[in-house]
A protein has these predicted regions:
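Short coil-to-helix segment of the ABC ATPase nucleotide-binding domain corresponding to the Q-loop/switch region
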Residues: 93-101
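Conserved catalytic motifs of ABC-family nucleotide-binding domains
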Residues: 155
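ABC ATPase NBD coupling module
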Residues: 66-82, 87, 111-115, 224-228
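Conserved ABC ATPase signature
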Residues: 134-138, 142
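The feature captures the beta-strand-to-loop junction immediately N-terminal to the Walker
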Residues: 35-37
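Helix-to-loop junction immediately C-terminal to a conserved catalytic motif
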Residues: 50
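Conserved ABC ATPase "signature" region
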Residues: 65, 101, 112-130, 178-181
Length: 245
């Protein structure tokens, strides 16, 4: 049984059905991409999976629990879901260290546990040298690493990443890709949606391409990049990028 099993998602706004029966799944220790052109329904599907939007129909099962109607905080607390928003979510006026400690305090961790966990995350994400810097003064890549570190505080089984490669330079993208691969090695499931399909496909085990509210195709990077309909409607008719994986 997959860790995350999404079946038959439907969402209608007015007379327009923006998501029409989307299914996908993610296993533990697997990186899965959710791709598609603007207006395809991928973002709505992703946000229904997170608990930001409630579906009109369909199911979201996380770790064997049906969480379809659960708000995001319950999915995080009781379902083992971590979430990285597209928009920067750091506390700008707090130091890097206090960004981590504040979340730990909200989760009810005792002082000794907070300190130990904080040191580990600062080391793991190479942000120890900026621990006392206010978040408003650190770089975009450092903010991204801090956000991912915060998403790991609750020891999630799965992390949902919304546009993790947006607004950062190529070197930082490579660093974030390495971090995501390490999370997979630790057995954490990853679901990514991003408009930068090449960077996403370079690290995914499988991807789903959404078009007109439905899954157009799914498979490995080679399989989706060489799928005739995916090339026609999304990737274009340029060179086949079969070495993206």
């Amino acid at each position: 049984m997959p860790l995350l099993d999404v079946t038959g998602l439907v969402k209608t706004y007015g007379s327009r059905r923006v998501v029409d029966g989307v299914d996908f799944e993610v296993d533990s220790g697997e990186i899965v991409g959710l791709l598609g052109p603007n207006g395809a329904g991928k973002t709505t599907s992703f946000r229904m999976t997170c608990g930001i939007i409630e579906p009109d129909a369909g199911k979201v099962v996380l770790g064997g629990l049906e969480v379809t109607r659960w708000p995001m905080y319950l999915r995080a607390r009781d379902g083992g879901m971590g979430y990285l928003a597209q928009e920067q979510s750091v506390f700008r006026k707090l130091s890097v260290e206090n960004n981590l400690l504040a979340v730990m305090e909200m989760l009810g961790m005792d002082r000794a546990a907070r300190r130990k966990r904080c040191e580990g995350l600062l080391e793991q994400f190479d942000i120890k040298h900026i621990r006392r810097s206010k978040a408003m003064f650190i770089s975009g890549g450092e903010k991204r690493r801090l956000e991912i570190a915060r998403s790991l505080i609750s020891n999630p089984k799965i992390i949902l990443l919304d546009e993790p490669f947006t607004g950062i330079d190529p070197v930082t993208i490579n660093n974030i890709q390495r971090i995501i691969r390490r999370l997979r090695e630790d057995g954490i499931a990853i679901l990514i949606t991003d408009h930068r399909e090449q960077e996403t496909l370079a690290i995914t085990d499988r991807s789903y391409v959404i078009r007109s509210g439905k899954v157009l195709c799914h498979g490995t990077a080679d399989e989706v990049l060489n799928h005739p309909d995916a090339r026609k409607y999304y990737f274009g008719d340029g060179p086949k990028l079969g070495d993206a994986a």
